[in-house]
């Protein structure tokens, strides 16, 4: 029981402690234990990849989705023989398919290695150089901002307040002449 109320044999009203066990980090019932065990740690290095949908975030939808109809088209009145058109379609499709596979077999792993190194360097520089430089700059600029704030409050504020008071009594009257 959590947070309930009960009456003892003498008629005194008591509340049940919210947690009867001492350790707040361990679940006190089976439902909580099951809930915690369902949460799995996500590890990017051991996740399974989808071999069917290889572009789940649709990065290349508008770039490399090139089919035969996107490249070669014959307008009305200018048609080649049907056999030539079918052979051209098959040649284009099969060539594109197998040449892509050949290129990815030859250069896929080296390019993955190069891009992996590049993004590792980029992540390293961002974590260990860029962010600390920005934080350092923000800390150092605070000193300058205080001096600038003092300058504004001691010089510019009174000056512009005086100029404002000078021009506050200026009145412009417009008359329409007929």
Swiss-Prot record:
A lipid is attached at residues 133, 143, 156 (S-palmitoyl cysteine). Residues 2-104, 126-178 are cytoplasmic. The keyword Protein biosynthesis does not apply. It is a peripheral membrane protein. Residues 149-160 are annotated as: Interacts with SPRY1, SPRY2, and SPRY4. Its main location: Golgi. Disulfide bonds: none annotated. The modification N6-acetyllysine is found at residue 5. The keyword Cell inner membrane does not apply. Residues 82-94 are annotated as: Interaction with CAVIN3. Residues 2-94 are annotated as: Required for homooligomerization. It holds the Pfam family Caveolin. One of its GO terms (biological process) is cell differentiation. Residues 105-125 dip into the membrane without crossing it. The modification Phosphotyrosine is found at residues 6, 14, 25. GO terms for molecular function: molecular adaptor activity; oxysterol binding; protein kinase binding; transmembrane transporter binding. There is a cross-link at residues 5, 26, 30, 39, 47, 57 (Glycyl lysine isopeptide (Lys-Gly) (interchain with G-Cter in ubiquitin)). Phosphorylated at Tyr-14 by ABL1 in response to oxidative stress. Ubiquitinated. Undergo monoubiquitination and multi- and/or polyubiquitination. Monoubiquitination of N-terminal lysines promotes integration in a ternary complex with UBXN6 and VCP which promotes oligomeric CAV1 targeting to lysosomes for degradation. Ubiquitinated by ZNRF1; leading to degradation and modulation of the TLR4-mediated immune response. Keywords: Acetylation, Cell membrane, Golgi apparatus, Isopeptide bond, Lipoprotein, Membrane, Palmitate, Phosphoprotein, Ubl conjugation. Belongs to the caveolin family. Homooligomer. Interacts with GLIPR2. Interacts with NOSTRIN. Interacts with SNAP25 and STX1A. Interacts (via the N-terminus) with DPP4; the interaction is direct. Interacts with CTNNB1, CDH1 and JUP. Interacts with PACSIN2; this interaction induces membrane tubulation. Interacts with SLC7A9. Interacts with BMX and BTK. Interacts with TGFBR1. Interacts with CAVIN3 (via leucine-zipper domain) in a cholesterol-sensitive manner. Interacts with CAVIN1. Interacts with EHD2 in a cholesterol-dependent manner. PANTHER family: CAVEOLIN, CAVEOLIN-1. This is Caveolin-1. It comes from Saimiri boliviensis boliviensis (Bolivian squirrel monkey). The lineage of its organism: Eukaryota, Metazoa, Chordata, Craniata, Vertebrata.
